[in-house]
Amino acid sequence: MAHLRGFANQHSRVDPEELFTKLDRIGKGSFGEVYKGIDNHTKEVVAIKIIDLEEAEDEIEDIQQEITVLSQCDSPYITRYFGSYLKSTKLWIIMEYLGGGSALDLLKPGPLEETYIATILREILKGLDYLHSERKIHRDIKAANVLLSEQGDVKLADFGVAGQLTDTQIKRNTFVGTPFWMAPEVIKQSAYDFKADIWSLGITAIELAKGEPPNSDLHPMRVLFLIPKNSPPTLEGQHSKPFKEFVEACLNKDPRFRPTAKELLKHKFITRYTKKTSFLTELIDRYKRWKSEGHGEESSSEDSDIDGEAEDGEQGPIWTFPPTIRPSPHSKLHKGTALHSSQKPAEPVKRQPRSQCLSTLVRPVFGELKEKHKQSGGSVGALEELENAFSLAEESCPGISDKLMVHLVERVQRFSHNRNHLTSTR
């Protein structure tokens, strides 16, 4: 219950039901449920995310991180955060209501013209330019995390895995994001910076053009092995040369040669093909017509545990919470949930520590094996995949590698004992 005490100290204890009227449910995911609501004082429409902290212990740090980042942001290109309220074990997070749905929703009725794509990408770039100027990395850019207002305004959302760079920490090395959109340097857990978001933007550009990211037909774990090894994806098909060049610029495997968000705003695909954001209302209307015709009912929650239907049948936006790899509790991510920067962070939830054998045994052994293979002219690809498998397993289940090593040692000891016993009886 320590995490509840921490939240109670940092969030208003005013009964949120006195301040807000909860209306239709417009989304459901691993972080809880999202409702359309009304601010009783201003009569403004808001989004209310309600999380049961007792049921979401594994997500406490992500919730803290999202609130921390959102409370520090002040940009028309970032979803606005209005405050948090704790009622019993339920945390109410009040945010800007964006009734146009996500960019992923807008893809469902069919392909987008390049003018729409360029306009959406321009607004994402403005959001990234702001975040990066604030020394923040989003780390999970994709169509599902781009929301639109009913007027066509485009805003970045879902900051549960966003990272903060300090003056003394120029690059990060935590393994987070969604596999298909993840930059090679993030997968390899090399030091990385804002340029990781630019790679994800390039994948998102392909997603907007094709309806899905590259390698979407493969298992996500397989994709994590392929992205660092393979050549960067390219935009194939009947698309303009400037669009293909934009994608190519984003998807340079060497992050040093990827342009910044500010530089990409000057790219000819952005400067020549974009229109005002009000132009995007055509896509929002298209999606609403498509939904009203009964499409998407069967597959609306196919990729995540979403329920996007309003209870009264109203066509509300689907607030998506797709599967994302989250940072381990021992990453150097600056955490802490606060309404004001002077407040202390909530007590972190204790979790299983990462395996010690990774640094003392696994990595040294793989390093020696790879060196021997290189000297003999052999390929180290299979060894790198196996080494990466340990890291991936550790992210989802900290401590699993140590358990594996204990079992292996016990098995070897039993085998050696049995063998010695047989030898001594002969």
Swiss-Prot record:
Subcellular location, record wording: Cytoplasm; Golgi apparatus
Gene3D superfamilies referenced in this protein's UniProt entry, alphabetically: 1.10.12.70, Phosphorylase Kinase, domain 1, Transferase(Phosphotransferase) domain 1
Residue positions, PTM Phosphothreonine: 174
Signal peptide positions (record): none
Molecular function terms from GO: ATP binding; metal ion binding; protein homodimerization activity; protein kinase activity; protein serine kinase activity; protein serine/threonine kinase activity
Sites bearing Phosphoserine, chain numbering: 278
Domain Protein kinase: 20-270
Keywords: ATP-binding, Cytoplasm, Golgi apparatus, Kinase, Magnesium, Metal-binding, Nucleotide-binding, Phosphoprotein, Serine/threonine-protein kinase, Transferase
Compositional bias (Acidic residues): 299-314
GO aspect biological process, one term: axonogenesis
Regulation: Interaction with Golgi matrix protein GOLGA2 leads to autophosphorylation on Thr-174, possibly as a consequence of stabilization of dimer formation. The C-terminal non-catalytic region inhibits the kinase activity.
Outcome reported for the amino acid change (mutating residue 158 to A): Loss of kinase activity
Assembly behavior: Homodimer. Interacts with CTTNBP2NL. Part of the core of STRIPAK complexes composed of PP2A catalytic and scaffolding subunits, the striatins (PP2A regulatory subunits), the striatin-associated proteins MOB4, STRIP1 and STRIP2, PDCD10 and members of the STE20 kinases, such as STK24 and STK26. Interacts with TAOK3 (via N-terminus); the interaction promotes STK25 abundance at the level of protein expression and/or stability.
Keyword ATP-binding assigned: yes
Tissue-level expression: Ubiquitously expressed. Highest levels are found in testis, large intestine, brain and stomach followed by heart and lung.
Reaction(s) this enzyme catalyzes, per UniProt: L-seryl-[protein] + ATP = O-phospho-L-seryl-[protein] + ADP + H(+); L-threonyl-[protein] + ATP = O-phospho-L-threonyl-[protein] + ADP + H(+)
SMART domains noted in UniProt: S_TKc
Protein name in UniProt: Serine/threonine-protein kinase 25
Binding positions for ATP per the UniProt entry: 26-34, 49
